[in-house]
Amino acid sequence: MAQRRAAAESARHQRLLEGKAQAEGGSARTSLLILVSIFTIAAFLMFLVYKNFPQLSEEEGKCIKIPRDMDDAKALGKVLSKYKDTFYVQVLVAYFATYVFLQTFAIPGSIFLSILSGFLYPFPLALFLVCLCSGLGASFCYMLSYLVGRPVVYKYLTEKAVKWSEQVERHREHLINYIIFLRITPFLPNWFINITSPVINVPLKVFFIGTFLGVAPPSFVAIKAGTTLYQLTTAGEAVSWNSLFVLMILAILSILPALFQKKLKQKFE
C-alpha cells in the first residue's frame, strides 16, 4: 500500500513538472536573455570593485584572477597578504564580492577562496566570512533560479527534481537539518540544490540558514588548511581522513533530530 502511494506521488510530481515544462518552455529564451543581462550587470559591479583596488605592479596584476588551481591560489594569496593590512577594506570587499559572485553563478573556484581565507584572516573571521558568502551567494543563486531558471529545471532536470522533491517532502518538518546534512555531505551537488530548491518550494529563509550552518564544517577544514597554504600542492590535500571522519560524524548528528522525532511519532501513533 505504501509503495503504491509512493509510486502515485512520484507520478504526480513527474506530471506536475512536465506540465510546467510545457507551459513555460516558450519562456526559456526570455529567461536566458534576463540571465545574461543580470550576469553582465554583476560582472560590471565586479569590475568597479577591482577598479577600487590599490595600484598593482604588472606582475602582481597577473595574479589577480579567480584561482583555478593551488598555484593560482598561492600567487593570489601572496599579493593579497601584501596589501590587506594597508588596504584592509578594499581587500575584504574584493574577497567578499568575488566569493558571492562565484556562488551566485555557480562558477568553480570558491574552494580555493575558502582555503585562502585561512591564510589571510584569523580563523573566527575567516569562518564567518566563508559561511556568510556561501549563504548569500547560494541564496542569490536560489533567487536567480526562481526568477529565470525554472524553465531550465523543468526541461532538463525534471526526473532529478522529482526525486529530490520527494526527499524534501519526507523531511519537511526538519528541513533545516536536512539542508545542513546535504551541505556537509557530497550526495547532491551544491549547484543542483541551489537551482532546484525554489522549484520544489524550499523556503528561502530555511535555505539560507541551512546553507550558512551546513557549509561551516567543510569550510572549517578548508580554512585550517589555508594556514599552511604554501605547503599544499592541490585542493585535495586540504582534506585528510581525520577531517572526513569528523564531517561524517557531523552529518549524522545533523540528521539525528529528524530521525528521533520520526521514530517517536511512529511509536505513539
Curated annotation (Swiss-Prot):
The VTT domain was previously called the SNARE-assoc domain. As there is no evidence that this domain associates with SNARE proteins, it was renamed as VMP1, TMEM41, and TVP38 (VTT) domain. GO terms for molecular function: phospholipid scramblase activity. It comes from Gallus gallus. One of its GO terms (biological process) is nervous system development. Keywords: Autophagy, Endoplasmic reticulum, Lipid transport, Membrane, Neurogenesis, Transmembrane, Transmembrane helix, Transport. InterPro entries: TM41A/B, VTT_dom. This is Transmembrane protein 41B. Residues 118-229 are annotated as: VTT domain. It is a multi-pass membrane protein. It catalyses: a 1,2-diacyl-sn-glycero-3-phospho-L-serine(in) = a 1,2-diacyl-sn-glycero-3-phospho-L-serine(out); cholesterol(in) = cholesterol(out); a 1,2-diacyl-sn-glycero-3-phosphocholine(in) = a 1,2-diacyl-sn-glycero-3-phosphocholine(out); a 1,2-diacyl-sn-glycero-3-phosphoethanolamine(in) = a 1,2-diacyl-sn-glycero-3-phosphoethanolamine(out). It is found in: Endoplasmic reticulum membrane; Endomembrane system. One of its GO terms (cellular component) is mitochondria-associated endoplasmic reticulum membrane contact site. Belongs to the TMEM41 family. Phospholipid scramblase involved in lipid homeostasis and membrane dynamics processes. Has phospholipid scramblase activity toward cholesterol and phosphatidylserine, as well as phosphatidylethanolamine and phosphatidylcholine. Required for autophagosome formation: participates in early stages of autophagosome biogenesis at the endoplasmic reticulum (ER) membrane by reequilibrating the leaflets of the ER as lipids are extracted by ATG2 (ATG2A or ATG2B) to mediate autophagosome assembly. The chain crosses the membrane at residues 30-50, 87-107, 125-147, 175-195, 203-223, 240-260. It holds the Pfam family VTT_dom.
